[in-house]
Design a protein with these regions (language model features):
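Alpha-helix C-terminal capping segments
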Residues: 41, 48-60, 82, 316-319
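Active-site nucleophile and cofactor-binding loops and adjacent substrate-binding regions
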Residues: 37-47, 65-69, 91-101, 301-305, ...
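Conserved post-catalytic alpha-helical subdomain immediately downstream of the catalytic base
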Residues: 273, 289-359, 365
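Hydrophobic beta-strand scaffold residues
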Residues: 61, 87, 182-184, 217
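Conserved phosphate/ATP/ADP-binding segment of small-molecule kinases
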Residues: 189-287
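Positively charged, low-complexity intrinsically disordered leader regions
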Residues: 1-33
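A short helix->loop->beta-strand "cap" motif at the edges of active sites that frequently abuts
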Residues: 58, 177-181, 257-261
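Conserved N-terminal subdomain of the carbohydrate kinase-like
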Residues: 60-155, 352-365
Length: 365
């Protein structure tokens, strides 16, 4: 497949993300409600993707976000710097000292174990990035003057506020103006859309955004809720994806949105919180490519696995243009990311490629 990427020589960044980055507070093996200490990480649905591109795949990336200008914001910046992601595009917003004007988001997340599923409890109302408008970012400068080869954003950020919807559209329209490839993860969260118009608003916004997207990421529920497409013959409990039905739906979506060059989703069957069957598929040029199956994958922390899949997928598409190879990069990277704590990857490209090639868990000496 030909994505017609901008040459690296004319762009400062290989990839940038647009979205919220939160402080993740992790009680480890315990529960949020009984914790006496938390381990801190950074994470965000859009940011995790470009963080993986930088840390695992050594691409030059930056994050477009906003923080309240206080100690917590500086902690977040420090985490991002440790991941190697450029912080020069962060908007720092004045605060009144108690968070009435704006604040930084918190995400309390339990990993789950066995029959006890993972639990997320986010505290993200009135955050700096949710209050940001298109005027807070100079997209002409970012995509025109600096140059960006790939923009990744998604439905979690779009659902934060009315302003977020507008900011996503402004960013992707400017990105397309300068030839930047756009990927978008639908990532439908009913609770996030409920305050700004519910599913009707989600469809209104996502149908407009979809007109500018080159690589769309989303499962069957996302496509139904956000874009109004249905899969025939799918399991009512959404435990197993009907691949023939998914392919038919994607072909229909591609007719509606001929700008789609690739569509991808992970395939996850939850046995327990710590054992999942895992794979992924990618549609491109009318064909469906399925990644290697990871049956009975043992998981330490599932949060961010889908974002790490997207990192590998984007890397594969950017460097090879081969959808089959790209979806295998994505599935392997996502699988490895779920074997370590935190939202973001601790894997190397060498490890990803070894897993793709069938390597096991023998001791490396």
């Amino acid at each position: 497949m030909n994505l017609n990427l901008r040459p690296a020589s004319e762009c400062k960044f290989d990839a940038v993300s647009l979205g919220e980055v939160m402080l993740r507070l992790d009680p480890g093996e315990g529960r949020i409600r009984t914790a006496r200490s938390f381990r801190a990480w950074e994470g965000g649905g859009e940011y995790n993707v470009i963080r993986g591109l930088r840390k695992c795949f050594k691409m030059n990336t930056a994050v477009i976000t906003a923080f309240a200008d206080n100690e917590v914001g500086m902690l977040m910046e420090d985490f991002i710097c440790q991941g190697g992601v450029d912080t020069s595009l962060i908007k720092w917003m004045k605060t009144d000292g108690i968070g009435r004007i704006c604040r930084n988001g918190l995400n309390f997340t339990e990993r789950g174990f066995g029959i006890r599923g993972a639990v997320g409890c986010s505290d993200r109302a009135n955050t700096a990035i949710s209050k940001a408008t298109p005027d807070d970012f100079d997209f002409e400068y970012i995509f025109g003057t600096l140059g960006v080869r790939w923009l990744h954003t998604g439905g979690i950020y779009a659902a934060l506020s009315e302003q977020s919807c507008e900011t996503v559209l402004a960013a992707i329209k400017t990105a397309k103006k300068y030839g930047t490839i756009v990927s978008y993860d639908l990532n439908y969260r009913p609770s996030m859309w409920s305050a700004i118009g519910g599913q009707a608003k989600a469809q209104e916004v996502n149908k407009e955004i979809a007109k500018y997207v080159d690589v769309m990421i989303g499962n069957e529920e996302d496509f139904t809720a956000c874009l109004g497409f249905e899969i025939e013959g799918n399991d009512a409990d959404l435990k197993e994806l009907n691949l023939d039905g998914y392919k038919k739906m994607i072909n229909e979506a591609a007719k509606t949105y001929p700008n789609f060059k690739a569509v991808a989703t992970t395939l996850r069957t939850v046995k327990t919180a710590t054992v999942n069957d895992w794979s992924a598929i990618c549609w491109a040029d009318g064909e469906i490519y399925k990644a290697k199956d990871y049956k009975g994958l043992e998981i330490m922390d599932r949060v961010g696995g889908g974002d790490s899949f997207a990192s590998g997928l984007v890397y594969g598409l950017m460097t090879t243009g081969d959808a089959e190879l790209a979806v295998n990069y994505g599935a392997a990277h996502g699988a490895l990311a779920m074997t370590t704590p935190g939202d973001t990857t601790m894997a190397t490209k060498k490890e990803v490629e070894a897993i793709m090639g069938g390597a096991g868990a023998r001791v490396q000496r």
